[in-house]
């Protein structure tokens, strides 16, 4: 059974930075992403929806820039789930907010674990656009993930989600 790929691969007019698709987001966080249609699914919804199925795969055939955005989202969800294990909703919210905003490596920098799969930004301006898009992406993903992980109880995270925190998608971590 193959891994699930992004449904946004067929979009042709999506801007890219490096070779990451800067897909529209349904978000209230500031950043360079275009606003998505509220009635449609965006890449954040897709990352959350496909996470549990895709996290079991060690190999993932990249078919386009939207798949690279999906991979980044899947790896970020894994990191988030590792951080919220055992925390109540308020503490998890603070933890994930600081995780989303902390300094992180982008493709092309020495600390980025997926440099073999991602192209570096072409210029310093492109690097800044990539960093701000990924920051906006991380903030929105962390915010929406909390509503899934704490859907039933606010005292502790759902075991249905945290059981996936030890799984390594593609044997990688951010």
From Swiss-Prot:
GO terms for biological process: actin cortical patch assembly; actin cortical patch organization; actin filament branching; Arp2/3 complex-mediated actin nucleation; endocytosis; establishment or maintenance of cell polarity; regulation of actin filament polymerization. The keyword Cytoplasm applies. GO terms for cellular component: actin cortical patch; Arp2/3 protein complex; cell division site; cell tip; cytosol; nucleus. Keywords: Actin-binding, Cytoplasm, Cytoskeleton. GO terms for molecular function: actin filament binding. It is found in: Cytoplasm, Cytoskeleton, Actin patch. Belongs to the ARPC3 family. Functions as a component of the Arp2/3 complex which is involved in regulation of actin polymerization and together with an activating nucleation-promoting factor (NPF) mediates the formation of branched actin networks. Component of the Arp2/3 complex composed of arp2, act2, arc1/p41-ARC, arc2/p34-ARC, arc3/p21-ARC, arc4/p20-ARC and arc5/p16-ARC. This is Actin-related protein 2/3 complex subunit 3. It comes from Schizosaccharomyces pombe (strain 972 / ATCC 24843) (Fission yeast). The gene is arc3.
């Amino acid at each position: 059974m193959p891994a699930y790929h992004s449904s946004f691969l067929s979009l042709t007019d999506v801007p890219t930075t490096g070779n990451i698709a800067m897909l529209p987001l349904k978000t209230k966080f500031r950043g360079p992403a275009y606003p998505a249609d509220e009635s449609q699914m965006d890449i954040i919804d897709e990352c959350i929806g496909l996470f549990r199925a895709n996290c079991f795969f060690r190999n993932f055939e990249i078919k386009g820039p939207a798949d690279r955005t999906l991979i980044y989202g899947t790896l970020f969800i894994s990191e988030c789930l590792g951080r919220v294990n055992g925390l109540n909703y308020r503490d998890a919210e603070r933890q994930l907010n600081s995780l989303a905003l902390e300094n992180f490596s982008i493709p092309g920098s020495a600390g980025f674990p997926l440099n073999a799969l991602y192209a570096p930004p072409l210029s310093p301006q492109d690097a800044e656009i990539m960093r701000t898009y990924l920051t906006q992406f991380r903030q929105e993903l962390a915010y929406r993930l909390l509503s899934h992980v704490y859907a039933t109880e606010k005292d502790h995270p759902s075991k249905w989600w945290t059981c996936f925190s030890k799984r390594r998608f593609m044997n990688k971590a951010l």
